Regions:
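Short, small-residue-biased leader/transition segments that mark boundaries at the very start
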Residues: 2-7
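Secondary-structure junction motif
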Residues: 14, 54, 58-83, 147-148
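Beta-alpha-beta core module
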Residues: 21-35, 95-145
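Flexible hinge/capping segments at coil-to-helix
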Residues: 21-36, 40-62
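Short helix-loop capping/hinge motifs at secondary-structure junctions, enriched
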Residues: 43-52, 130-132, 143-149
Length: 164
């Protein structure tokens, strides 16, 4: 089934990433686990739904970030990156992605965490009715001590994660 394929892919992706982190003396610190959502324009016909399926997203363009030329299939940020979509657009920055979400009625898959103060009211998060979870966190060198500003930033992230 598609759900078990996603789970196997995520499990393999996690194994590959753990090996790379270990080999480079890095560690991942999880802030929280999130259920998959989509970001869409508040004018998109799906914006009023309590949750959407991948099937309902088929007519809309899927927007994702370019991963760079040294991209590996196993580094993919998107939880459902193996899903076949008829319309794919890759962007390099968040502003372009949000402009295309609004202008083309596109969507992207995300954690559901959005800040209205930062992003305005034009973009909304809608839960995705698919199995899976996203591990949100940060990567640091093992045994490194963050700078004063780094510590302030990490404390702000942890506080934000607790309150979302």
């Amino acid at each position: 089934s598609a759900a078990s394929d996603v789970y196997k892919r995520q499990e393999f992706n996690q194994t590959v990433l753990h090996k790379i982190l270990k080999a480079n003396d890095l560690q991942f610190t999880e802030l929280f686990e999130a259920e998959p959502h989509i970001f869409i324009s508040n004018k998109n016909p799906l914006a009023e739904k309590s949750a959407v399926t991948m099937q309902e997203l088929q007519p809309y363009p899927y927007l994702s970030f370019e991963q760079g030329e040294h991209n590996s299939f196993y580094y993919s940020e998107e939880i459902f990156s193996t899903e076949i979509r008829s319309k794919n657009i890759r962007v390099r920055d968040r502003a372009t992605l949000f402009n295309l979400l609004i202008g083309l009625n596109g969507y992207t898959i995300c954690s559901g965490v959005i800040d209205e103060e930062l992003n305005g009211k034009n973009i909304v998060a809608v839960p995705l009715r698919e199995k899976g979870s996203m591990h949100i966190g940060y990567i640091t060198r093992k045994q490194s001590i963050p700078s004063r500003l780094g510590s302030i930033y990490l404390d702000a992230l942890k506080h934000y994660a607790k309150n979302t």
